[in-house]
Amino acid sequence: MAILQNSRQSHKQLPIISQTIRSAWCQQRPINAMHQDVRQKSIGSGNETKLEAKETEVPTNRRRRRRRCSSSSTSDSSASSYSSTDSDSGSSTSSSSIRSQLPALNLPVPLPLATPTPPAVSSPHQAPSPRRNSSDSNRSVSPVEVPVDPHAWTPEDIASWVRWATRKFKLDPEPDIDRFPKDAQELCDLSRADFWVCAGSRRGGMLLAQHFAISLYHATGRETSPMLNDDEPNPYQLLNAASHRLVAQGSGGQIQLWQFLLELLADSSNANAISWEGQSGEFRLIDPDEVARRWGERKAKPNMNYDKLSRALRYYYDKNIMTKVHGKRYAYKFDFHGLMAACQAQAQGGDPASSMLGSYNHHAGGAMQLGRHPPPLHHHPQHSHPHHQLGQPHFLHPHHSSPASNSSSLGFPSSSTASSQASPGQAPASSSASTSNFTAPFQGGTAGVDPARTSTSSAGNYDQGPVTPTTNAFN
């Protein structure tokens, strides 16, 4: 009975329970619907803001460290934004402030990249370069003082003059000082062709010959016009000048066949065996067997004959040193340009014993002294002029054919300009040496006479400086 009563009570309570469940179910549906509709506004906004704050917490800490390194103000603002993330309104404000500061956070990153290379840093490196170049150029044309009279030059003066002219006129290739004579008298005896051979180039020989002729003129008052013109010496003169150097060089050491032939041609006593034909570099073996015998003696080859000698000569055809003259027996012709190239190559090879451009002791008879061919006119120091005193000022006028010009191509006055100034013959005689101060002789311009010239000291001052030095100053 008790069981039945309990079952009845449970049946009675079922509608009540179902009603309770039904009412509870009906009350939660609008709550769920409201939750779904207003999730982002009321219930979910705080949670989402907190999630966003947590997500931005890590990069905020990183940015805070960067801002802390850069400036204290930025670190304070990052700390305040971090503390305001506890509330919904504070989190939205901090997130907006962070977004507004994001562009500013990127600004310090490129700035340090540009600061190490300011424009002022490169200027100190660029400024010294022109000063270095100017100092090098000043050193390259530093003044050189030598005696007024080239006849009084020492070997050191000759070397200083060659070095100065090389730098001043930018001679290329640079002349070898050892090619020039060490004696002043021998240097004064050089012809224009000798200067070509000493310089080793056309331009170098022309400029050195012209400048030295000017120095001789200012010392002696005598013009050396053949050394001042721009006409090239004929091949005979050049080859003959080179052959005289080989004679002065001596017979020791290794020597090439073409050098040996030039040695024989330089001595007129060998005319019965070999001689020049004309003045174009052509020569003829008068006695080819005698020439071959002498060549065998020089090379210590007693079996030498003309057949072997001619085969050796054919080797020079491809080198453009010499050629065979067709239609003439035992006749050959030197090619000066190929010969000079061979001389320069041999000199650069460091074999002074076999180089015709090696150490020079001028031939006692002077350059171009052959019996059948007179040498070109050049200055002879033994020819004196009583009205010219050494060291007196003279103005060179090498181009008499152009009186309208006030300055020659070398930078000195022409005859019309010189005639209006003090004449060499009118200059007072002086027993003491005077000076001539040359300032860049080849740079052009007219020369002036220093009015402060006295009877005891006369000077041709080209920069109107003091008249006290006793030397030529090549600037």
Swiss-Prot record:
Pfam families from the UniProt entry: Ets (PF00178), SAM_PNT (PF02198)
Protein name per the record: DNA-binding protein D-ETS-6
Binding region for DNA: 255-335
Gene this protein is translated from: Ets21C
Basic residues compositional bias, start-end: 375-388
Expression (tissue specificity): Embryonic ventral nervous system and 1 pair of neurons in each thoracic segment.
Protein keywords: DNA-binding, Nucleus
Positions of transmembrane segments: none
Organism: Drosophila melanogaster
